[in-house]
Regions:
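Boundary/entry segment of secreted carbohydrate-active catalytic domains
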Residues: 1-13
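Active-site-proximal loop/turn and secondary-structure-junction residues that shape catalytic pockets
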Residues: 9-11, 34-36, 69-72, 114-116
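Active-site acidic/histidine proton-transfer and metal-coordination neighborhood
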Residues: 16-17, 57-58, 62, 75-131
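Catalytic domains of carbohydrate-active enzymes, especially glycoside hydrolases
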Residues: 16-35, 103-104
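Generic structural signal for well-ordered alpha-helices
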Residues: 19-22, 46-54, 93-97
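Conserved beta-strand positions in the central sheet of alpha/beta enzyme cores
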Residues: 31, 65-67, 109
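Glycine-rich, proline-tolerant flexible connector loops at the mouths of alpha/beta enzymes
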Residues: 33-57, 112-119
């Protein structure tokens, strides 16, 4: 069994130093929170993925995937009545899926309860259809 740590807990360090610390304290892998890469997670791109790959290689740890996928984003929600908001969330998750794959990760932890909770008054069945 491998153990991984979300890099959010070390976001006060540079990405490279954080990954090195994760390895130093005995973890074999890292889950990356997108908001630790850019202030606006919607702006993450392939160069950010490349930086993560290099930092993980240097530290000798594996990128297991992404975590807190929709945290610190605005205008994204999985079950909101606004179709544009749902579509934007879908496109963002597709982008993160590609970046996870590029980094060699296999796990995506949604977390981010505000973007997946039901809007007040929305029946579960309606929210399920929207998602």
């Amino acid at each position: 069994m491998k153990f991984a740590l979300c890099n959010e807990v070390l976001q006060h360090l540079s990405l490279e130093d954080g990954f090195a610390k994760i390895a130093e304290i005995g973890y074999q892998g890292v889950e990356i929170a997108p908001f630790t890469l850019k202030e606006n997670p919607l702006e993450i791109d392939e160069s950010d993925a490349d930086r993560c790959i290099e930092a993980a290689k240097s530290a000798g740890i594996e990128i297991v995937g992404l975590h807190w996928l929709m945290a610190k984003t605005e205008g994204l929600h999985l079950t909101h009545p606004d179709e544009d908001m749902r579509n934007a969330a879908c496109e963002y998750l597709k982008k993160l899926t590609n970046l996870t794959s590029q980094m060699g990760g296999k796990i995506m932890v949604l977390g981010s309860p505000q973007q997946r909770n039901l809007e007040p008054g929305t029946p579960y069945e309606v929210a399920f259809e929207r998602a």
